[in-house]
Amino acid sequence: MSHQEQQFQHYPHHQHHHHHHHHHIHQVQSETQLEQRSSDLEPNRSRNTDRIGSSMDFRNLCQRIDVDGLKAKLPQLKLPKSLPKLRGRKIFRSSKSGSNAAGGGTAGGSAKDGAGAAQQTHLQVAGQSQQFINRTPQRISTISSLMYEGEQEEIRANLGQSQPGTYRSAGSLDDDYYAPGSGDRASRPISPIKIPVVGALDDSSPSENGNVRTTFTQRLQRGYKSLSELRIKHIFAKQTTVRRDNIEVDRYVEQYERELKSEKLARERRDREIAENYDIKIKTLAGTRQNTFDDDDVEHEQFERGKISHETDESGMEATPPLPSRRKPGIAATRFAKVRKPPLEMEEEQQQAAAEESPQANPPPPPPPRPSSYKQLLINKLPHLPSLPNLPQFSRTKEETTKTAENADENNASRKLSIRQNIKRLRKSIKRPSKIKSKAAAPVPDSDEEEATPDGQKTKDAPTRSSTANLRARLSRFASTEQLQQRWRKSFKVAKEPEELETKAEGSATGGASGVLGGLLVGSQLEKTLAKLNEKVHQLKFFQRNANNQNATTSKQPKPNTVGHEPIEIDDDELEATYHRSDSLEAENGNGNENDDSGEDISAEEAFGQIQEEDNEEDHSQDQTKRGQSSVSGIATAHAARQMAKLAEIQAASKSGAAAWSSESLEEIADEDYPRVLIHQEHSDAYESTLIIAVASKGSSMSPVVRSSGLKSSPAAGPKTSPHPEIRISASGPQKSMSYSPGNPRGEPVTKRSPSPEFKTPAGGNKIVPKSETSAWLPNEQIIAGFKEQTSWPAPALYKPKSIDIFEASAGGSAAFADFDEALRNAPVLRISAGSSIDTSGEEADDSCSRVTRIRVQSPQIGNSRESLMAQEEEDKEAERDSEEEEEERDPSERPPSESPPPPPLPQRRPPTKRPATPPIYDAVPPPLPVSKPPPPPSVETIPSVASLPSPAPVTRSMAQRSASMSRPAKPLVKTSSLRLTYNEQVRPGDVGKVNKLISRFEGGRPRLCPRRMHSEEYERCAQPEDEEPEMEQILELQIIERRAVDSVTPTNRAVVIPQITVNNNNNNERQLEQSDQSDQSAHQEITDTRKTKSMELALDRQNSNCSRSEYGSPLSFPSSRRSSTPTNLNANSNSNPNPSTNPNQNPSQILQHQRRSRRSMTRDDDNFYSFDSDEENSYYSISPSGSSRYVVEI
């Protein structure tokens, strides 16, 4: 066993193989031990148990453990005696099991401890492994234990007995990993309390052999410690750490489980809310509503009104769908919207007819007969509204002169009056409701019903503001009722519809208000804009939902704007409860809406129009200015700012109810779950990135969304359903640009108009430069522009977004947003991104914009738009940082921003020992070395993992590197840019936070830096061969500095890692490392020979550090992945390293892939890896997560 153990000493470094070997060893040892055990199985168990008990207080452990079961498992558990690199889990679990079983035996079979000391030694080794629950860095001690295992098996057994908690537990990685141990651990998965060895000895002292064993075991321990200093170190450090960690682990697990439970509860709660909302949507159906509300006369009355509004009143219909949207962009709303929109298109034809009829104010009968009667009611009642004359005039005036600023001003004046009145009413009604409404927010369907009802009631009762009074009365009554939430939604939204619809219109919660008001306004404007709207609605179908609010907002905001906004009709369509009728209903709305304009909806419309003029002010800033409403919107902006604040409050109280189609109306989903972010997801084989751009904080997302609705029907569309439409928009970006293109020209000016390139940069930049993508992103950018213009929300900080690759699926979204929060807090970093215009693009103003855009532009070049975008942005940020820190290197054209500082490869671990180790490998390899070109293909093989693009161009290393790096960025981008992903995958859950902190600290929350390194690597590979001299000269300054930093940082790792690797020549990883290291060494030699080579080496260092960083894998395995490819390129470039570097590169390329796999598996599997390499790994990451020491250097 000692021989095997010695072999396994080497394997520990090569974990991948090592595991297999460990399993084998487990079998072998288990056979020998089983023989011994079979002879003295019971005595051994009892003695072993006694020893274990003596060494540790297993009675405590036994309390938790099924001693008998453990005893049964002990023979198996003890089989692997401190197999060096078995998982710490294995060892610890078996140790726990063994020690627990032993503890049980100690308790139950202490009398059995008579003889069998030798056998007990073996058993104790396993048992002690079981005893040792520590999962901390037992790997090293495990390696040493493997080295000494055969020799010190008895010693170890004794040691384990005397010091089960100290080394022995650390010694056998089995404990945690071994299956029986795992089974035992299943009962108490974290770890039984690790009692100090002394305590255990004292506790087990009752057992005679236990005491003797303890003394003997202690002697053995001391001997073993003397044998292995590593063990002693780890025993001491780990002994304490192990116990502490185990306890902490228990706490951690409990906490983790609690967190999981809480998360699960929250998730279930959200799901329930969604389900409730969805159910409410179902209830929203006329029949269901009737059934539901028949009991409640008021509710039923409201429902009837709502149903009427749904059936007859476009506004009612309009109002209700926004509520579903509010509820949450749930599947029904988002997906059915698509399903319904074709009917909407068909309805649009009806709408055209209706729009034609709309001037007549005769509702087209195609909708339920109620529309006509309802419209008639509206016609009858609307005249009664005090504001009716003004608003109908304005609405008609706007219908007639939609683009006249005069009418806008008039409307603004009347609207301001009505808005203020309505807001006053709204405040009165909302003050209570806001509280209730938060509750009511869940059953938004009621609010839908009420939304529809309010529309209907508005139009019907609007003539008599008494509807508001009635609603208030109802609210008061309902407030007293337990059904207050539902009734409140109904009554409050009825009351709020006139009032808050104004606010909603303001808050782009105008879904319902837009339905009524927008429908009214749209009715008049539909005639004028209906053809455009129909055309564009077809185009904007995707955005109809999104634009619906916007459309409502647009239609309400400026009737003038409505002309320009196709989405208005869409908004009506979308807002229509049926979504089918939206066009015909909207046409009805056109008919009835003109009348409705004169209805109390006028007050809502005025409030809304004013609010929306504010939105329009954004829109008008961009669009309204065209319409001459900018003067009005100027006033409306101040007023809207106030009302938006109030609306935000209202929405905060009831996110779902407050805004019909505001992203907040999306309720928590868009508002809370998403900070109002543009999520751009691109998934390619090589690379999946989610580019999340935080547009606004949650709170501001309401009003920003609203404003964005005001901004453009299309941009508003994005905001309204912002989360869903954003994605959808990006998906249908070309369509949106198509459909939005009428608005898009405005959008484009809006984007440009948005003074902050910061906004434009992330969202706008991407959006603006690529038109299709621009349309995809434009809504956000325009939204941001609107936000920035109207709201004082810190658009630069908030929106200066970190485009985050969310590779971490579970926490990715939330973590990414947390990063956004940090980034928003750290706006300077984002602004630095603006500085990064120095990067490839000199667009400092549109820095992030150009950067994002440039990235996106490059993405087609690279062929991985997401990858390119991510890498490019990261390049931009990194180049930005480089620009900051390396202004000297601010020659973006000469050197790609990512290239500007070639990522310092992890200091190439090229220990002389490794070089010797590799030469034997190279002995076979030398022939390939002459083939410098073939080695580059291996490097390409290495690169293939990164990007298996051009393996053939090794000789042209510039070409090969370039092509390789071009295709290569894909996976490296993922690896490098997905530090957190890799960390999440490979870091123990407890360490994720630390890793993220490290990453964030050095990344500045910019995972993209890694992809940028890939680009820099790419550029270096490409440019260094070509521009190597000039570019490398520049880069060398950084590289030298960075290399110093890297060397200063990583030399320890280098020394530590490489010597280990060199020592462990048996391991493939070692060989890979040796090969890659030797290739690095040879490359280093080449580099030494050539400054290009040296700069390349620096690049290698950076790349290596990037790679090791990106691949969470240990630094050891890193060289194979990235360094190997870089060395291969280096070898290709400077074949001065003849055979060794070339062939090593080939081998490394192959080994690299294998090593990546093994390292990935190791990192994911390995607690040992962390325990063992965690220090090195962390040091790397403290360097590399910083963007490889380059961050340290740059920053």
Curated annotation (Swiss-Prot):
Record's compositionally biased regions (Basic residues): 11-26, 422-438
Please give the knockout or disruption phenotype noted for this protein: Viable however, rhabdomeres are flat and oblong, and alignment or organization of the microvillar projections along the depth of the retina are not maintained. Severity of the phenotype increases with age, by seven days post-eclosion rhabdomeres have become irregular, misaligned and fragmented structures. The phototransduction proteins ninaE and, to a much lesser extent, didum are displaced from vesicles near the rhabdomere terminal web and instead become mislocalized to the basal lateral membranes.
Q: What is this protein called?
A: Protein PIP82
- Source organism per UniProt: Drosophila melanogaster
Q: Where is the composition biased (Basic and acidic residues)?
A: 37-50, 300-313, 494-505, 1086-1095
The gene that this protein is the product of is PIP82
Q: Where is the composition biased (Low complexity)?
A: 1-10, 109-118, 351-360, 940-968, 1114-1149, 1179-1195
Summary of the function given for this chain in its UniProt record? Required for the morphological differentiation and maintenance of the rhabdomeric photoreceptor apical domain. Acts as a downstream component of the gl and Pph13 transcriptional pathway which is required for photoreceptor cell development. Likely to function by regulating the trafficking or retention of rhabdomeric proteins including the phototransduction proteins ninaE and didum.
Q: Compositional bias of type Polar residues: which residue ranges?
A: 119-132, 545-560, 732-742, 856-867, 1075-1085, 1102-1111
Cellular component terms, GO, for this chain's entry? apical cortex; cytoplasm; cytosol; nucleus; rhabdomere
Q: Which UniProt keywords apply?
A: Cell projection, Cytoplasm
